[in-house]
């Protein structure tokens, strides 16, 4: 399974949508709109 939004993550598979700066981000994130279907970002 994937971790909840704002939980720490190391890989894309850790999150339901995307991982930014090591944190799971919600697909409704206004900074990365539609991140659930976008490329994986790890900054």
Curated annotation (Swiss-Prot):
Report the residues modified as 4-hydroxyproline.
Answer: 8, 26
Look up the record and report any one GO term of the cellular component aspect.
extracellular region
Where is it mainly found?
secreted
Provide the tissue specificity. Answer: Expressed by the venom duct.
* UniProt modified residues of type D-phenylalanine: 41
Gene Ontology MF term list:
sodium channel regulator activity; toxin activity
Q: Where does this one sit in the cell?
A: Secreted
Cited Pfam families: Toxin_19
* 6'-bromotryptophan carried by residues: 30
State the disulfide connectivity: 2-16, 9-19, 15-24, 18-35
Keyword set, alphabetical order: Bromination, D-amino acid, Disulfide bond, Hydroxylation, Ion channel impairing toxin, Neurotoxin, Secreted, Toxin, Voltage-gated sodium channel impairing toxin
Domain writeup: The cysteine framework is XI (C-C-CC-CC-C-C).
- Which family is this protein grouped under? Belongs to the conotoxin I1 superfamily.
Protein role:
Iota-conotoxins bind to voltage-gated sodium channels (Nav) and act as agonists by shifting the voltage-dependence of activation to more hyperpolarized levels. Produces general excitatory symptoms.
User: Per its record, how is this protein called by name?
Assistant: Iota-conotoxin-like Fi11.6
Supply the source organism for this entry. Conus figulinus
């Amino acid at each position: 399974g994937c971790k909840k939004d704002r939980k720490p993550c190391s890989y894309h598979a850790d999150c339901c949508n995307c991982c930014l700066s090591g944190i799971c981000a919600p697909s409704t994130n206004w900074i990365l709109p539609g991140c659930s279907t976008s490329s994986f970002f790890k900054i």
